[in-house]
């Protein structure tokens, strides 16, 4: 699943505590990432030792997973707010595995470098077609020609006519 790539990217940059904000129906995420002793025992007992790494990959050893239920789906900001007790005052990354990007240097490592330099909130954005704008949060940039772009506002899933730009989060 795409979320696997997001988790592996986080682990690759040194993140060792991961919070999943899910609805109560999303048991599959917890089932996917939690160590499952029952399955491991069953695989050992049936001579399928080679399958254990696929079920409980060692990449997750030392990683702490938190699962927080968001009862009412009130947007991304509300989802992040639900993690406040786990995050505290520490810097954090929000990974949205809706899209997958391939690059020589991971998107998250680039964001962390910019954060460490600017000591400010950093967003990864991507230019999208007008026909897809209604699917994304879209930024209203202060100055589209600056680098990095300063964001004045984010409009959640606007129509193409209401979108302040064609740059999505």
Locations of the language-model features?
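Catalytic-core segments of class I nucleotidyltransferases/pyrophosphorylases
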Residues: 112-116, 143-169
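Well-ordered alpha-helical segments embedded in enzymatic catalytic cores
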Residues: 2-6, 78-82, 153
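Short, acidic Gly/Pro/Ser/Thr-rich loop/turn segments
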Residues: 27, 102, 159-162
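Acidic side chains
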Residues: 12, 34, 78, 98-99, ...
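Conserved beta-loop-beta/alpha segment of the NTase-like Rossmann-fold superfamily
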Residues: 39-42, 52-143
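Short, conserved micro-motifs enriched in small and acidic residues
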Residues: 1, 77, 166-169
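N-terminal glycine-rich phosphate-binding loop and ensuing alpha1 helix
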Residues: 1-48, 65, 106-110
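Short loop/turn motifs at secondary-structure junctions
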Residues: 14-16, 88, 117, 150
């Amino acid at each position: 699943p795409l979320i696997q790539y997001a988790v592996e990217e986080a682990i690759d940059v040194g993140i060792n505590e991961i919070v999943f904000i899910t609805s109560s129906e999303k048991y599959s995420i917890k089932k996917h990432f939690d160590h499952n002793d029952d399955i491991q025992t069953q695989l050992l007992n049936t001579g399928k030792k080679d399958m254990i790494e696929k079920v409980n990959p060692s990449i997750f050893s030392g990683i702490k997973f938190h699962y927080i239920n968001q009862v009412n789906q009130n947007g991304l900001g509300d989802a992040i707010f639900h993690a406040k007790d786990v995050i505290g005052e520490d810097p954090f990354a929000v990974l949205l595995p809706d899209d997958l990007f391939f690059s020589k240097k991971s998107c998250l490592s680039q964001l962390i470098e910019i954060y460490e330099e600017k000591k400010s909130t950093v967003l990864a954005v991507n230019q999208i077609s007008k026909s897809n704008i209604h699917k994304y949060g879209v930024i209203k940039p202060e100055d589209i020609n600056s680098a990095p772009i300063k964001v004045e506002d984010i409009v959640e899933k606007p129509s193409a006519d209401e979108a302040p730009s064609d740059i999505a989060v």
